[in-house]
From Swiss-Prot:
Protein name as annotated: Small ribosomal subunit biogenesis GTPase RsgA
Major localization class: cytoplasm
Gene Ontology MF annotations: GTP binding; GTPase activity; metal ion binding; rRNA binding
EC number: 3.6.1.-
Cofactors demanded by this protein: Zn(2+)
Amino acid sequence: MQGKIIESLAGFYYVESDGQIYQTRARGNFRKKGHKPYVGDEVDFSAKENSEGYILAIHERKNSLVRPPIVNIDQAVVIISAKEPDFNHNLLDRFLILLEHRKISPIIYLSKTDLLEDLDEFKKVQKQYQKIGYYFVYYLEDLTPLLKDKITVFMGQTGVGKTTLLNTLAPDLALETNEISDSLGRGRHTTRAVTLYNIYGGKIADTPGFSSLDYEITSSEELNAAFPELLKLSAACKFRSCTHTHEPGCAVKLALAQRKIWEKRYQTYLQILSEIENRRETYKKVLKRK
């Protein structure tokens, strides 16, 4: 039989096949090979009626996220709050960079707009991200049509309203939520496992919240590729290995001077580039000590 893993919990993998859910375990050979099944995996499995089944094979994956562990994702809704916690340009860009690097299409959803007096400021932000090529929405009626026939991950900083949004989309789920802590300005984690839910003709994952992001990006070339607007311009740079910082004939620096690209995004690029270089220098020092 073939199916898709829709939930992983306490060593069990729940596989959906032909409208039925089967409780399965992974064969021991997966552990020996270090090839663990994840939510989103297409698998071959065996199962008898009213008995526990076993995963026999895992199909090739098209992409993956490490944290949360989920694979074969079509798109990700990055939920960023307008307030409580306050809107964070830098954090949003870091989510987008992660998704670009992982070849997952992002959708930006602005939550908690009811706490704003007006949306004028964010309409300007929306235009900037739309100019890059991203969906940027803050109404459910704009989001729901984008979910059909897709596997969609919901992700964002803790406390931005992921679970609340899912409960609005599908009240029958009744997922647990918690309010923001006044002292910390962040929410408590309420999502304990990665689970795929059937909603609006697609599958949606509510994932554990994040306070920080880990990257596999280790070079300026990889970072450049994670910024669509910089990648497009970099073909016109004088030097192929241009870092868009000090090199002559840099098309990105020219576009920045002409205000054709958003300076806030460029500043995020410079910050992360500096972090990459600092990690590289730290690694070199460690190697010298050895």
